[in-house]
């Protein structure tokens, strides 16, 4: 067990809450003490949902542990059914209630409720939130759609002549990063291709919609962390293939279109939608100083991290210097992607390890979660959020998808703008000492005579006795600066005047200038970097 102030994922019952809240007429009864009743805060404050999540808690207290907590759970189930009248019910235990082993599934079955009851066995001390969401969605699909599954070996019936191909969108949940906007974007894209979206699940789906998932021709998996397990079950029992391409970025969206056209049985030369993304042209037309070769560190859930690395390198010209995820279930995929970019994958759920890696790599842009936003702010590095977990500002009122062609536009804006936002500050810093633009200068329209120039402070008279002391100090400094021949120089120290000169270099190339100068000094065995060293390095690498 680890004490921390931040976690990338909650316990698995939080994932179950995300699925239950996304569904329309399903209720979740959670065996939990008072301290675990925080779902209202997650969904109403952070996601700003206009309704409370469909979760009922038993809220047992310490004094109840000496009595019959199982009876408390049965009472809570009965009351939840009578009050909310759901068409299906999920039952499970929180991480704390799991310790008392009351078996919520067996207790709910004993009530013989007239609706399907889905028992959730979520090992809170071995698994986490995304796994809990995936397992919950899988169990819901298996319980509700299972009775309609054909007998094993039954061939899938052909689509009726003239009927439009149809599919399901699987994976979006409550509290997901831009899930609602992604659903709207991909639904519109599929409709323009002539493909009907039959059901979106779990977001906005009813129990009856889940039961009829097998009627679609194929499934589109938007978020493998949540939907891949359920999609695999539907493929085995209903013969429904599912997509493997995640449509994040222009190239991936085009590959996604080719894949769905093949699954839908439509010709490969079907015209693409008219509203293509502007980001490819923007990426080519924007000053290459802002984009080409920018060092970027990426961390998030596996789906968004892998997609972000691909977009960063193939569509924006960035250089990936770090790639990682907190999703241990998809660690192999992230490691394979990291090998492609020549970096070592960072698989961890400890934000301190992530912060140490960012500080070590000195990237020029960080793409990550809410925590990476805080890390980048502390380290003074531009940042954009690409993945859950996120805070309230990443549930915007505007339309802001991550997927599809419009999602590519959003990615370009949100990734490139942080790199450009510091230009004004840099210009102010450059001209702060100028006679015309210093802080004490009058407004330009008032004329230079409006404010008298500040009086210069008188220089202290140097006494003759100080001269030898100054000379001795300079000699000692020179002796310290000159290293012994046997001591190799690893990292040279920056002289104050050289550090000041370095700050005059525009921030978007300052990091490269620093690295080149330190490399130049190390190759020549210089212990101290002076202004002359800085300009010698510039001339050397300029050639």
UniProtKB/Swiss-Prot annotation:
The answer to whether UniProt assigns keyword Ribonucleoprotein to this entry is no
Per the record, the GO terms for biological process are: light-independent bacteriochlorophyll biosynthetic process; photosynthesis, dark reaction
* UniProt catalytic activity: chlorophyllide a + oxidized 2[4Fe-4S]-[ferredoxin] + 2 ADP + 2 phosphate = protochlorophyllide a + reduced 2[4Fe-4S]-[ferredoxin] + 2 ATP + 2 H2O
Print the keywords alphabetically: 4Fe-4S, ATP-binding, Bacteriochlorophyll biosynthesis, Chlorophyll biosynthesis, Iron, Iron-sulfur, Metal-binding, Nucleotide-binding, Oxidoreductase, Photosynthesis
Task: Give the source's domain of life in one word.
Answer: Bacteria
Please provide, alphabetically and separated by semicolons, the GO molecular function terms listed in this UniProt record.
4 iron, 4 sulfur cluster binding; ATP binding; metal ion binding; oxidoreductase activity, acting on iron-sulfur proteins as donors; oxidoreductase activity, acting on the CH-CH group of donors, iron-sulfur protein as acceptor
According to UniProt, this protein's pathway is:
Porphyrin-containing compound metabolism; bacteriochlorophyll biosynthesis (light-independent)
Which coenzyme or cofactor does it need? [4Fe-4S] cluster
* Sequence positions that bind [4Fe-4S] cluster: 36
Q: What is its EC number?
A: 1.3.7.7
Identify the Gene3D superfamilies for this entry: 1.20.89.20, Nitrogenase molybdenum iron protein domain (3.40.50.1980), Proto-chlorophyllide reductase 57 kD subunit B (1.10.8.550)
Q: Which residues bind substrate?
A: 422-423
Q: Which InterPro entries does the entry mention? A: ChlB/BchB/BchZ, LI-POR_suB-like_C, Nase/OxRdtase_comp1, P-CP_red_C, Protochl_reductB, Protochlorophyllide_Rdtase
Enzyme class (EC, first level): oxidoreductase
Family (UniProt): Belongs to the ChlB/BchB/BchZ family.
Quote the protein name from its UniProt record.
Light-independent protochlorophyllide reductase subunit B
Give the organism the record lists: Rubrivivax gelatinosus (strain NBRC 100245 / IL144)
